[in-house]
Amino acid sequence: MVIQKEKKSCGQVVEEWKEFVWNPRTHQFMGRTGTSWAFILLFYLVFYGFLTAMFTLTMWVMLQTVSDHTPKYQDRLATPGLMIRPKTENLDVIVNVSDTESWDQHVQKLNKFLEPYNDSIQAQKNDVCRPGRYYEQPDNGVLNYPKRACQFNRTQLGDCSGIGDPTHYGYSTGQPCVFIKMNRVISFYAGANQSMNVTCVGKRDEDAENLGNFVMFPANGNIDLIYFPYYGKKFHVNYTQPLVAVKFLNVTPNVEVNVECRINAANIATDDERDKFAPRVAFKLRINKT
């Protein structure tokens, strides 16, 4: 014989729920007395307080071993990478000479990028250094004492400086300037007391043919030793990264040209199997003319 369980009415369910939340007979709140709730809250307070204290202590101990100015560990690759300016999506520099809007965005980006390189700003913040040697500065033991940096003046970029330039870095005439920027690597030395230089080529034979002639600023794409070593963002507050400007004079119009630029120095390996692209940057250049 099957005994059917009596179905509770809605009122009974509500009454049972109210009694669970607060039972006036046993003085229990949600099935526990005040003492029971106090012990539970005390347990979790002590438990999570202990975890917080342990986490804080371990973080404090770890931070005592880390310098706020120089990283304790550095990347396995000591070779600096390269980037280009203007910064574009997918590293594609596309210029429609007759369409001002196509290259005006590049000009605006370059104006902002080169503003810290103005000669007047450099004269206020940085030193005039003797070329051809590293600008090494001893550690005087005062961590908050900033290192000095050498001037890199905008006028060193010649026809690509954009100073009084009616051609807007050459973009309005189909002779655009592209700037090569080397990433900062703390305590990097080029080696052999010889300046580094940047070279650019077409990636394939047809690219080399379509690339045409170009000129570099500073001359021969040289990067002087005075901008090294780099001591870090907090030590080298006013450090200015050296640039190499490449002005492309007669790129074959309406053709996509693959360009590769690399940095050359005695202490930079260009055949490192761990990262074959570390000392170079590849980008596409297209000059559209109607």
Curated annotation (Swiss-Prot):
<feature type="transmembrane region" description="Helical; Signal-anchor for type II membrane protein">
    <location>
        <begin position="40"/>
        <end position="67"/>
    </location>
</feature>
<feature type="glycosylation site" description="N-linked (GlcNAc...) asparagine">
    <location>
        <position position="193"/>
    </location>
</feature>
<feature type="glycosylation site" description="N-linked (GlcNAc...) asparagine">
    <location>
        <position position="238"/>
    </location>
</feature>
<dbReference type="GO" id="GO:0001671">
    <property type="term" value="F:ATPase activator activity"/>
</dbReference>
<keyword id="KW-1133">Transmembrane helix</keyword>
<keyword id="KW-0735">Signal-anchor</keyword>
<keyword id="KW-0633">Potassium transport</keyword>
<keyword id="KW-0915">Sodium</keyword>
<keyword id="KW-0325">Glycoprotein</keyword>
<keyword id="KW-0130">Cell adhesion</keyword>
<feature type="disulfide bond">
    <location>
        <begin position="129"/>
        <end position="150"/>
    </location>
</feature>
<keyword id="KW-0740">Sodium/potassium transport</keyword>
<dbReference type="InterPro" id="IPR038702">
    <property type="entry name" value="Na/K_ATPase_sub_beta_sf"/>
</dbReference>
<keyword id="KW-1003">Cell membrane</keyword>
<feature type="region of interest" description="immunoglobulin-like">
    <location>
        <begin position="193"/>
        <end position="289"/>
    </location>
</feature>
<keyword id="KW-0406">Ion transport</keyword>
<feature type="disulfide bond">
    <location>
        <begin position="160"/>
        <end position="177"/>
    </location>
</feature>
<comment type="similarity">
    <text>Belongs to the X(+)/potassium ATPases subunit beta family.</text>
</comment>
<keyword id="KW-1015">Disulfide bond</keyword>
<keyword id="KW-0739">Sodium transport</keyword>
<protein>
    <recommendedName>
        <fullName>Sodium/potassium-transporting ATPase subunit beta-2</fullName>
    </recommendedName>
</protein>
<keyword id="KW-0812">Transmembrane</keyword>
<feature type="topological domain" description="Extracellular">
    <location>
        <begin position="68"/>
        <end position="290"/>
    </location>
</feature>
<comment type="function">
    <text>Mediates cell adhesion of neurons and astrocytes, and promotes neurite outgrowth.</text>
</comment>
<comment type="function">
    <text>This is the non-catalytic component of the active enzyme, which catalyzes the hydrolysis of ATP coupled with the exchange of Na(+) and K(+) ions across the plasma membrane. The exact function of the beta-2 subunit is not known.</text>
</comment>
<keyword id="KW-0472">Membrane</keyword>
<feature type="glycosylation site" description="N-linked (GlcNAc...) asparagine">
    <location>
        <position position="197"/>
    </location>
</feature>
<dbReference type="Pfam" id="PF00287">
    <property type="entry name" value="Na_K-ATPase"/>
</dbReference>
<feature type="topological domain" description="Cytoplasmic">
    <location>
        <begin position="1"/>
        <end position="39"/>
    </location>
</feature>
<feature type="disulfide bond">
    <location>
        <begin position="200"/>
        <end position="261"/>
    </location>
</feature>
<dbReference type="GO" id="GO:0006883">
    <property type="term" value="P:intracellular sodium ion homeostasis"/>
</dbReference>
<dbReference type="GO" id="GO:1990573">
    <property type="term" value="P:potassium ion import across plasma membrane"/>
</dbReference>
<dbReference type="GO" id="GO:0030007">
    <property type="term" value="P:intracellular potassium ion homeostasis"/>
</dbReference>
<dbReference type="InterPro" id="IPR000402">
    <property type="entry name" value="Na/K_ATPase_sub_beta"/>
</dbReference>
<feature type="glycosylation site" description="N-linked (GlcNAc...) asparagine">
    <location>
        <position position="153"/>
    </location>
</feature>
<dbReference type="GO" id="GO:0005890">
    <property type="term" value="C:sodium:potassium-exchanging ATPase complex"/>
</dbReference>
<dbReference type="GO" id="GO:0007155">
    <property type="term" value="P:cell adhesion"/>
</dbReference>
<dbReference type="GO" id="GO:0036376">
    <property type="term" value="P:sodium ion export across plasma membrane"/>
</dbReference>
<feature type="glycosylation site" description="N-linked (GlcNAc...) asparagine">
    <location>
        <position position="96"/>
    </location>
</feature>
<keyword id="KW-0630">Potassium</keyword>
<comment type="subunit">
    <text>The sodium/potassium-transporting ATPase is composed of a catalytic alpha subunit, an auxiliary non-catalytic beta subunit and an additional regulatory subunit. Interacts with BSG.</text>
</comment>
<feature type="glycosylation site" description="N-linked (GlcNAc...) asparagine">
    <location>
        <position position="118"/>
    </location>
</feature>
